[in-house]
Structure formats: structure tokens, C-alpha cells
């Protein structure tokens, strides 16, 4: 069986977590990590994968089956999502709820033009938490749905605030 060849775009906490998840799945292999940093400064755990600049991405076309986009929803994904979906199958965790329809339209248009598939907003919320709410609401149709998400509660928003640090 051929393994699914994965590329990771962005190697922060999410990218590192994706690398660990890939290592635990026998049907996948990490092929490359793409970064805006100097590739020599990025140390990954997967010895068989390479680290490349974002500019080198297109040279890997045909060698990667799926790109996992690990950028932030505020500024990274709105730009990189459609750009990368034009050349690769992509999956991301875009989570700016109010902008999902616009983001979907942009990624879908680019992916279709390139003969690719772009799967968006597959994270905690939207994503796993959304599915949990859907299941609960289908059973408890008269119930009330509450979330702990609200204005400025997203980590991305908090980390961009003055005085925030890891």
C-alpha cells in the first residue's frame, strides 16, 4: 500500500503536533515541512523529511498528496489557503466563523481550478466541537446550545494582543 505523502506548511505548535500525528499513522509519511524561517534553523523529528522555504513549495508538486496548512486564521490562511490549494490538495483549521463562507469560496475556486480538493475549518471549532454540538442538537432538539467561544477568546486573537507571549 502506498503511503499518503504529507506536507506541513508552518512549523509552530500546530505543525509540530501534526508531525507527531503523522508519525503515529502507518499509512502516512511526512515528506516536507515548509517554513518562512531559514530552513537550516528548523529542526524536525522526521529524519526522512526535508525542510524547505515557502518559495520552494511548487517544486514539490507531484511529490506531496496533501498539504496540512498550520498557519493562523487571522492573517496566514486567508492568503496561503487559496494560493496553496491551486497547486495541492489542502486541509486546514480556519476558525474565523464570520469569514468561513468567504474563505470557502476562495479556497474552493482555487482548488477546483487546479484540479485539487481544499478541506477547510477542520479543527476544534469549527470542527470537532461543531460535530459534538450537531450530535447533541439532533438528540436534544429542545435543548439550549452553549459554547465557551466568544469575542477575543480565540488563542490567535489573544496572542496578537499587546503583552501576550507563549
How would you label these PLM feature ranges?
Residues 6-8, 69:
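Hydrophobic Val/Ile/Leu positions in short beta-strands of Rossmann-like dinucleotide-binding domains
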Residues 15-16:
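N-terminal Rossmann-fold NAD(P) dinucleotide-binding loop
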Residues 24-45:
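NAD(P)-binding Rossmann-fold cofactor-contacting core
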Residues 49-56:
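Short acidic-hydrophobic, aromatic-tinged amphipathic segments that line or gate anion-handling sites
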Residues 57-66, 74-93:
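Rossmann-fold NAD(P) dinucleotide-binding segment
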Residues 124-125, 129-166:
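Conserved anion/nucleotide-ligand pocket segment
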Amino acid at each position: 500500500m502506498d503511503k499518503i505523502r504529507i506536507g506541513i506548511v508552518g512549523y509552530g505548535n500546530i505543525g509540530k503536533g501534526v508531525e507527531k500525528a503523522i508519525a503515529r499513522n502507518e499509512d502516512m509519511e511526512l515528506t516536507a515541512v515548509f517554513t518562512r524561517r531559514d530552513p537550516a534553523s528548523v529542526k524536525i523529528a522526521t529524519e526522512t523529511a526535508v525542510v524547505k522555504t515557502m518559495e520552494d513549495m511548487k517544486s514539490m508538486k507531484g511529490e506531496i498528496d496533501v498539504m496540512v496548512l498550520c498557519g493562523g486564521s487571522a492573517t496566514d490562511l486567508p492568503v496561503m489557503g487559496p494560493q496553496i490549494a491551486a497547486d495541492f490538495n489542502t486541509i486546514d483549521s480556519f476558525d474565523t466563523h464570520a469569514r468561513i463562507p468567504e474563505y470557502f469560496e476562495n479556497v474552493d475556486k482555487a482548488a477546483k481550478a487546479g484540479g485539487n480538493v481544499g478541506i477547510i475549518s477542520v479543527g476544534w471549532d469549527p470542527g470537532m466541537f461543531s460535530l459534538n454540538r450537531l450530535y447533541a442538537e439532533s438528540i436534544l432538539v429542545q435543548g439550549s446550545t452553549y459554547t465557551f467561544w466568544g469575542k477575543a477568546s480565540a488563542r490567535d486573537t489573544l496572542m496578537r494582543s499587546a503583552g501576550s507571549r507563549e
